[in-house]
Amino acid sequence: MPGKANVEVTSTPKPIRHHAPKITDLHQMVVKLHGVNIGSISGLNDYTFLRLIGETGTDMNRFPTVKHFTNWCGLTPQNHQTGKVKKRVEGISCNKAGQIFKECAQGLLNSKYIAIGSFMRKLKGRKDVAIAIKAGAKKLAEAYYNAITKGIDYVEQGLKKHEQQLKIQEVSMLNRSAKKHKI
């Protein structure tokens, strides 16, 4: 990627609290590698990005779409059902990259101002903690894939906007239900 070597680094890195790597200017190296600031994705920092590059490599051409990437990470929901019969399948484990995304998602579970955290808490109430963490990890993996392959920066929409969208969705659902029952 010769065109991306001249990228100017203007952002500051996220702080790493525990087990910080002893690499000076890691943030600048990471941004110059792909030309995208991965630190804009909630839950991911430079060290996490370094670990993910170690697992996935720098060439993402082996994954044609985001669905192929999330499936390779082991973050897609598994539905072993035919007709009305659900098969009993032992838990399918993630690979190391999927586990890294799960660790990042678990850190966002109790976040106050991040939309992915709100999404996971809502899902945790309906399903299970493990399912919520896996779904949040899938969202992080999708944002990572889009940042690496397409250069799309992740923009955190925030908790208030997420809750407004949920409220609008709920109102439209109630309106449809009222029309259906002719109320």
Language model features by range: what are they?
Residues 1-183:
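A detector of single, family-specific signature residues
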